[in-house]
Amino acid sequence: MTLLLSIILLASCTKTEIEYRDVEVPVETIVEKIVTQTVTQTVNVVTPPEEYSFTRNGVSTVYYTGQSARLKMATAIKSAMNDQASTKTNVDNMFNNGTGFSDESLNSSGKKIGNKVGTSGSATVKPLFDEWITEFTTIVAPAVNNSITATRTIAGSYTEADGSRTVKVNAKGFELNQILSKGLIGALQVDQIINTYLSFTKLDGAKQDNDDDIYHYPTDGSAVPYITKMEHYWDEGFGYLQGLDNQYAPGLGDASIGRDGANLNYYLNKINGQEKEVGITKRIYDAFSAGRAAIVAKDYEERDRQANIIGVELSKVIGYKSQYYLRSAAGKIGKGEWADALHALAEAYGFILGLQYTKAADGQPYLTHAEVNEHLSSLSAGDGGFWDRTPAELTTMADQLQQSTGLSE
């Protein structure tokens, strides 16, 4: 019994060995192959020219004769509004019908100013110009012809004691040719440039035609159209600034071709001489050139960027000059130089009217129509109007405009 048990126990303790062998197993490997493919894409790159010159098939596509005509009309109307021989019928025809000018080319141009005044804003602005024409020709001019000396509440002519200046004014001291001509700088030129021809609504309305290269306008003397609507709209905006000056360079051209102080570009170049705005004429000119090149390249984002530059920079002319002439008038009143003071106040009045057509960096005008009217009412308050103003009042108003525009010389 004992022997058998021992055998069983020994059998239970026997060790089992495990044999390991190397076995070849197939492995699937995934390899990514990078393939480089060259894709050619045509991109229009905007390269603005150094001068405002654009051609197609060897023919110029720049065309703004209508704007040049209107600027010449503005100059002639300014002169007529200082001529006591002018009649209401004559000046009204010049302004509203585009006739009655000594320059026959203007009479036959088919252009006029009246229907282009203040078109982007309140309908109450254009009638002001008609009222000024009526008042000068029916009240001021007859008073001057009758040798009436102007004073508070009395229309006529007023000459500085030293004979340096004579102004022809209404009963409130308004020198109406200055109010009208400076008013046109904002309500005609700035408004047409910023709020009409360079507006995104106007330009984008011609986008499809520009994309499809559909030409609508011939260059002068050509029967074949070479110009798209959008190109022409941009040129018209350019023409309202540069129409009496050199197309191929910023700044002022030869005065012999009709340039006058009734012109926006004339005052822009005055601003260019200020320390803070040196180079503003070239900035605006280059923006016009770059924007036009962008239209040719169909780069509308770049076009809009340049339009914004033009709007903001051009508006500075109205912003600076509106406050400048208020301060100038304050100084002249302080010296008792009333002819100079009335002249400066008329210029201030016209420029303030234009503030509603400006475009600040935020896209809004410096002043709304209502805010402009508040300033104009303050400036003309009382029976004596300009005659009643004090240096303190004018300085306060200039300070307010400086704050509204963010501009200081």
What residues fall within each predicted segment?
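Sec-dependent signal peptide recognition
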Residues: M1-L4
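Mature extracytoplasmic or organellar-lumen-exposed domains after removal of signal/transit peptides
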Residues: V43-E409
